[in-house]
């Protein structure tokens, strides 16, 4: 998938789910299920409930996403 096809939205992690997945509430009030990106796992960046994150989504499935950045 090319970079132009990816949609990015900021959101807040509301709930931790099993298997390193999270429920994220986006700024447009939608709730999605997201997992951490590989680079975040590799660098051991922790994501906790209440963290502000950047979520990457594909236009084909707007219910799932990938957490690519955790804001400080």
Curated annotation (Swiss-Prot):
CC terms in the record's Gene Ontology section: cytosol
Subunit structure: Component of the 30S ribosomal translation pre-initiation complex which assembles on the 30S ribosome in the order IF-2 and IF-3, IF-1 and N-formylmethionyl-tRNA(fMet); mRNA recruitment can occur at any time during PIC assembly.
Native organism: Agrobacterium fabrum (strain C58 / ATCC 33970) (Agrobacterium tumefaciens (strain C58))
Chief place of localization: cytoplasm
Gene transcribed to yield this protein: infA
Protein task: One of the essential components for the initiation of protein synthesis. Stabilizes the binding of IF-2 and IF-3 on the 30S subunit to which N-formylmethionyl-tRNA(fMet) subsequently binds. Helps modulate mRNA selection, yielding the 30S pre-initiation complex (PIC). Upon addition of the 50S ribosomal subunit IF-1, IF-2 and IF-3 are released leaving the mature 70S translation initiation complex.
GO MF entries: ribosome binding; rRNA binding; translation initiation factor activity
HAMAP family registered for this protein in UniProt: IF_1 (MF_00075)
PANTHER family given in the database record: TRANSLATION INITIATION FACTOR IF-1, CHLOROPLASTIC
UniProt xrefs under InterPro entries: NA-bd_OB-fold (IPR012340), RNA-binding_domain_S1_IF1 (IPR006196), TIF_IF1 (IPR004368)
Protein name: Translation initiation factor IF-1
Compartmental location: Cytoplasm
The entry's keywords: Cytoplasm, Initiation factor, Protein biosynthesis, RNA-binding, rRNA-binding
Coiled-coil parts of chain: none
Domain S1-like: 1-72
Family: Belongs to the IF-1 family.
Highest rank taxon of the organism: Bacteria
């Amino acid at each position: 998938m090319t970079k132009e096809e990816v949609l990015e939205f900021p959101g807040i992690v509301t709930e931790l789910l099993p298997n390193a997945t999270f429920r994220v509430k986006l700024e447009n009030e939608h709730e999605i299920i997201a997992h951490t990106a590989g680079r975040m796992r590799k660098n051991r960046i922790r994501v906790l409930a209440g963290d502000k994150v950047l979520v990457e989504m594909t236009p084909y499935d707007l219910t799932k996403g990938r957490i690519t950045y955790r804001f400080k």
